């Protein structure tokens, strides 16, 4: 088995769509979106998402050419300064879990953020009951910032636990 993590490109859009829709169907309680919403997306949206740009990059876990995991980094649209990014859209097929690939996704995403050099903060979070996410987040030095009550797309009411990693102090160059 030859497993690698790499940045996705526009050529990956069909595989991205297939895996993302699978994730939303099988694990609806861990995402902010739903299968019913994303299945309606036009191909052009998937192509743009897979292609990445200076506001986002998706990464894929690829096993012998097959996409088996995805994770992304996105400029935080709610942050007026443009200096913050959000990590999300993470999913790994069950067969590939508990093998260190989540850590490799963190490494790839944080490398992208640092290479961009304009970002100061990295945000991430999880549903309170998602212990695997909590462990990965804390392992990479993120600090808790808030518990936010949330109704999840699966209908469950459970806190969203927010974290932040400060890359550089405000005003530091």
Where are each of the predicted segments found?
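Acetyl-CoA-dependent GNAT
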Residues: 10-11, 18, 23-95, 106-108, ...
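Conserved active-site alpha-helix within GNAT-family acetyltransferase domains
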Residues: 103-104, 128-146
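Active-site acidic-Proline motif in GNAT/NAT acetyltransferases
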Residues: 93-95, 99, 128-129
